[in-house]
Regions:
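N-terminal cap/lid segment of alpha/beta-hydrolase-fold proteins
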Residues: 1-32
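Short, surface-exposed "cap/lid" segments of acyl-processing enzymes
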Residues: 28-79
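Alpha/beta-hydrolase
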Residues: 168-302
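Active-site nucleophile loop of the alpha/beta-hydrolase fold
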Residues: 151-162
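Alpha/beta-hydrolase active-site loop
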Residues: 87-115
Length: 361
């Protein structure tokens, strides 16, 4: 339910790391030493897609509710977005990937300290464009005394520059944000498919979605090689390569990588590419974890064969398909199913790292 500040119940508006943010914390349903799950949203969307809260909203239609039932506390983070009606001050046009990672880490540390959580371990989930901020978040979190034990990509894009041509309709708002495109039919079609997959009840009415769930995005986050120039009040080419901002090839500073990816043709790009893209980064992350010294005496041993099999099987084991499209975690049955898959993936990630350590110790 929204209040006079256009915030939903349980949301907090704050300025953290120099920029506005809205965050939502949901405690675990029972005392636990499980890591805090941090959910970071994607392009054009508030983190409300993880927890809902609009008038008439049903909590069980959203992921945060079911993760709390699994024993996790959940922190959902919205970066600076420009919305109508306004939710945050529109002061984030120059918000960069590095700012995103720092803001998310600072907010995470704040919640862990304020809520007196027993664990300083974190599992990061980021959706869609949120895949670009994983390394900056992990570095900033480590500097704050936090341990990011695992990353789970949700139909997420790694921090490479877009290999596709610039899409049409990129326009700059008066505040310097990338405007919500006039046609968001792709997103609406995907939400409709999720409605059908979840038994037919509307989860987010179209008018509510357009008014309260999406907003203009800082252009630098999108990976198009653009930034906002306050002098010309327009988007211009960014002199900093996107890969330098995202540090996507700094594999040593990734946590253990895992992924949930959609299977619907309505999100064909992620359905086709996510296993390969995150599997690629996972493999190089594992190579970095293993190191040359660890394998120097393994030639011809059974342990070397087991290590090869463990690494080669990792993308299949840790990158898991999920029924649905870009919003595969929205809707009661989908949200409940995905929460269970998240819990299983965290357990499997822990077991995987234990098995790897046993081979290279």
């Amino acid at each position: 339910m929204a209040n006079i500040n256009n915030l939903y119940t349980g949301e907090a508006l704050d300025t953290i790391a120099g920029f506005p943010t809205v965050y939502h914390y949901q405690p675990s349903d029972y005392d636990t030493t499980k890591p805090l799950i941090v959910c970071v949203t994607g392009g054009l969307h508030l983190a409300r897609v993880f927890y809902g809260g609009h008038d008439g909203s049903t909590p069980s239609n959203f992921l945060s509710y079911w993760l709390s039932k699994q024993g996790f506390s959940v922190l959902c983070l919205s970066y600076p977005l420009e919305t109508n009606p306004p939710i945050m001050p529109a002061t984030g046009a120059n918000f960069r990937i590095s700012d995103w990672g720092q803001q998310a880490a600072n907010t995470t540390a704040k919640i862990i300290n304020c809520k007196n959580l027993s664990s300083r371990s974190v599992v990061l989930i980021s959706w869609s464009m949120g895949g670009r901020m994983v390394v900056p978040f992990t570095i900033a979190a480590k500097n704050l005394g936090l341990h990011v034990q695992q990353y789970i990509a949700f139909a997420a894009t790694p921090g490479f520059s877009s290999i596709r041509p610039l899409p049409p309709g990129i326009t700059c708002s008066s505040s310097g944000y990338f405007r919500v495109p006039p046609h968001v039919d792709v997103f609406l079609g995907q939400l409709e498919e999720m409605r059908v997959l979840n038994g037919g009840a509307v989860v987010i009415p179209e008018d509510v979605y357009l008014r309260e769930y999406i907003g203009g995005t800082p252009i630098n986050l999108i990976g198009l090689g653009l930034k906002y120039d306050p002098v010309t009040r327009a988007f211009v080419r960014d002199e900093v390569p996107h890969e330098e901002d995202t540090r996507v090839l700094d594999v040593g500073n990734f946590p253990l990588i895992s992924a949930l990816y959609p299977t619907s043709v309505l999100d064909a790009s992620h359905a086709l590419a996510d296993k390969a893209s995150w599997g690629f980064l996972l493999t190089y992350k594992l190579e970095h974890m293993i190191g040359r010294i660890s394998v120097s005496n393994m030639q011809g041993t059974p342990e070397w064969k087991r290590l090869l099999n463990l690494v080669h099987d990792a993308p299949e084991r840790l990158c898991v398909p999920v029924p649905g499209n870009h919003f595969f975690f929205v809707g009661e049955s989908s949200a409940r199913d995905v929460a269970g898959r998240v819990a299983e993936l965290i357990d499997d990630g822990t077991a995987f790292e234990r098995g790897l350590a046993g081979l290279i110790s």
